Amino acid sequence: MDDLTAQALKDFTARYCDAWHEEHKSWPLSEELYGVPSPCIISTTEDAVYWQPQPFTGEQNVNAVERAFDIVIQPTIHTFYTTQFAGDMHAQFGDIKLTLLQTWSEDDFRRVQENLIGHLVTQKRLKLPPTLFIATLEEELEVISVCNLSGEVCKETLGTRKRTNLASNLAEFLNQLKPLL
């Protein structure tokens, strides 16, 4: 496990939860995750769940993705997706508004790995360098990804070579995120 990335993710999650507490006097609330089982759920309303991050359980790697492509995935990606269970968190990096993706449960972790595999299949078909997404943007065809060759974090337009480097590594990127509520 990459300790710098794990700590940066935990620190951002704490900043996010603290900001939520400050503004709403509660743990984060999600309507999107209502009805989806998770160890993160503290309580449920008629149409939403309150959640708090929980330690990840299970194998702490994305080896299914590695096996599918017979490649080695950046250690920071293993760490990013296996440090904790949590709800997705809205954030800002500079002037970029994003939703930081998280695994909600062990079932969700399997789904995330399947989506990462699908993403890599498309990139391979289009002969694009491999990236692994970590966040979504309002523009559907743009994501924040980690380049699997360099470990750099970039803003990427899906299906194209258009990439803008944002940070030299994932820990640096996470440390610069500001919570958005």
Swiss-Prot record:
One of its GO terms (cellular component) is cytoplasmic side of plasma membrane. CDD domains: Syd (cd16323). Belongs to the Syd family. It comes from Shigella flexneri. It is found in: Cell inner membrane. Keywords: Cell inner membrane, Cell membrane, Membrane. This is Protein Syd. It comes from the Bacteria. Interacts with the SecY protein in vivo. May bind preferentially to an uncomplexed state of SecY, thus functioning either as a chelating agent for excess SecY in the cell or as a regulatory factor that negatively controls the translocase function. It is a peripheral membrane protein.
